[in-house]
């Protein structure tokens, strides 16, 4: 509604200012789209009519080529710099290592010499004292008989203990005296425990040797004494000695730490010295020296001294080297607001003109949860950072993917340990015992094994479950006989389902965040295995719905297990053998059981033959119990495979609103509040400049910028409708960040894709068969090689995501990425969970950060739930994004959920469909708690097999659009050198989306995905830090400077670090000069960090003067019209909307008044134009013409006056023919006698004549005047003509020549709009004038 009022107001304003009267080509409706475009961009019309198109495109490409290629240029430059730095430092490191080795050897020699001197000194000082102490003991030992009784032996041992105690005291006292000796060097470097042991051992050995000379009878006893001295005295009293001896003296470990700290301090000193000087790497490449100059606040890396001399920067207000960091307290309710602002000032002091491009690199986040224990709070942040493991190489898309659980928080690890305990086995053990009691003949061994593992609580719980046995049997029987394959879930069926419902209650309304299911405080978070009865129900239902020879029993094993280890292989083989043995005992025709293992997702699939039915279901229970008894320690859950189907429909020709009963939504432009509203939406929207442009019809250069942008796009976009790409603003996203990056992989788990398609073969990647996939050759071919055997759903979805831009066919959202197509849907549009999990495992192995799932089921599959949960541990803990379609049944997913779209994980994103009218599609599912975002899904044109194209409709078409936008975001991150967190990518999509306001909330965010906003947000810092869109790229001319505002937010609780990189390129295209400015940034949001204090919200005050560099023109247009916003819906927009609404009403009211008055003036203008066109031939000028008109008026008035005596109250009509009118010519006198009654009557009765109808009332007063004038006579020959007097007889004869008819005989429909009604004598003259005008017409 606001949009319509806005457009109408602009049209009226233009109409009011438009003053020309006679313009027949004034078509206002043709400009409606132009006005409409100013408020919103619905349709982009590609224009081919541009003069000198070739030169225009070359200029445009040259102007923006660095913007597209800057990432590759920066990456190559960084790679080359590291190679040169490594090569140069390698030589320096070898020299330094040699020096260090020499120093270490010298230190070791000096230390060893010091040890020897100290030991010799102590040995000399203690030898005499120890001899005196040992003399008494030795005398007591040698006296008496050789054989001593036990009492004497104990007395001897006690004397030895006293001797040892006295010896320890002697050594300790000698060492304490030694420490006070000032002549000994490196006292703190000596290990006094080592000295104590060596001195004591030497003294004891020396004493033993002397005793051995005195007598050999006590040799064995002395050896035992020696061993006891070493093992007992030293070890038992080690703590006591260290407490007394080493009091105030550093230990060996502390000594080593001191050495490390000294070395690190030396390195810091050398680095500080280097930071103030120019570091030249003398290694050359093709472009010259690569120079690194470190300043106090930033670092410049370049291959030219010109950039060092010309460019200067002030980053003292933002760099962590100057301010340490920006401290912002974390607030969960306000983590999306950018509250702190700083500036970077860039100046050009040289003669050259440079092109500047901004980006960010090397982001790092440290989660401080669990790190700050009570003992660690005293440590500084630098010391705590040393405890965090450094991340591996950020290029994680190469190689084989694994699941990395190392980054689990303490809460998650504790919760995982709880899940791995006895809880998963409780339910199974209970049922196991029940079944053993009911089937003693068949299961004696199993009952004995399970009875040992049960406790009293399990037995009591078991008795309570016995009462539920018969109702469950009845329900299973009813479900089996039902026509639908869906089951009614019981209380003990799905613990997961209850957990999902509880997670919704914990979620905050209105936010798009998902709560992690691993909440240890949630009582329902215990993942209990499905019971055997439930598995039997699944088996029977699958048997009824799917006629297959085998059914897949999927067992999800613990994620930390290594399934390829010997232990796990033995466990799996034993379980298989026991199960085969049981089957062979009861089924003679049975051969063997096959199974499938998939890692790293860790699931085991056992193919159970379809030999069971309702008659022998007890045998199936026993088989499941046997399997559980062997694997229950390693299994998290198990269930039979479920069925999934795709979400698409054929082309529908009806209007979008036919079946749409939902409240209408309007497409509005969200507010933008960054940077003190300097570039806010309200200022632009209420600005009068566009109104002036409309009023004056100024065709400025800015009005053609969009045409320039669109003509730079792929040619195939002109061959079909691209409304879906237009409304999500993909074109500007391409213009800013390119078409994507080939290293980014999107895994399409669907019905496969046509390998030979022209639009896909450039991006489609088919994984070669490898043992890492753990598939048989046939199974692999089904999943990948034969993926073209499909009905087109997978090809259609794949084309939407990444159709190649090759001037043929269609173009995808991300035309330059890698697509991995995996088939799990068969030819009937259905697929099982076993194949789905297998496909997801292949995606993990290929390190795909994005997975598309345009399929689902209303049945909750615990195995798929666990599989999707483990996707957050891919890519070294970064996680993979799962984009899922919400469904096509117009249902509320909050009430009737569809999976996997409604899995409540932070890396799962549910997508609904939107139509061209910016309304949720009538077929699309919705849910204000479960559906996250909207995307185009109505009448989408894309690829199908055999190089054909087709229009499909459905949420299956909406999800690929979000996948494509996610791929563009990942591409920007990859270009900047890092891989983002999956949750952060989805938060970027949510916060940059376009708001769709409606009376009823249908999704979590009620917003449309915005490719341009997502790319810009990622390009300029993400959700932690943001720079304005205008500073992505700009030119810095001679003597100019640029103030770059940067805002910060507390997105998460922890410490975030990154580098703002400013790329510098000369405008001269032939130049190979390149440089980068690196500004380190740190944001601290954890208030528990020691000495945390919030930073000021505002930094330094800068003055912007006339030397400020201008924004780039094309980029400014993109930024001003971009629906790019990092905020949620702004309340200030309501005030602006109300003001605009009243202004529009006022404009409409003024316009209506003006148009009404204009209509009257236009009518008068046309009458005057007719008068001016009717000018008879004349010789004597304008005066004679006016005289003729006056004489004619008088003649007709006098002619009709006499006959009105008898018709005072009557209406009369007289018709005059065209020939009679032509007889009245200039310069002649009419002779009324020549008109006979017959001739006049013939002339009057001719039907083709135009008539003038005169209705005359109240002419009684004018009768005498009319007769008088007739008697007086008229002169038609001018001044020199004779006067002709008419007698009464001639006048009466003339009157008889005219026939009057009564007005009552005329029908009402004969009176036309041209009739003249004379109501009184006052307006007779006016009526006669109008009569004369019509008569001339």
UniProtKB/Swiss-Prot annotation:
Q: Per the record, where are the segments of Basic and acidic residues compositional bias?
A: 498-511
Q: Which residues are glycosylated?
A: 157, 335, 445, 449, 488, 546, 570, 637, 724, 816, 852, 888, 946, 1005, 1101
The scientific name of the source species is Plasmodium falciparum (isolate Palo Alto / Uganda)
Name recorded for this polypeptide: Subtilisin-like protease 2
User: Is Secreted among this UniProt entry's keywords?
Assistant: no
The Peptidase S8 domain covers: 722-1015
Question: GO CC annotations?
Answer: cytoplasmic vesicle; microneme membrane; plasma membrane
Write out the topological domains of type Extracellular: 683-1132
Q: Which SUPFAM superfamilies match?
A: Subtilisin-like
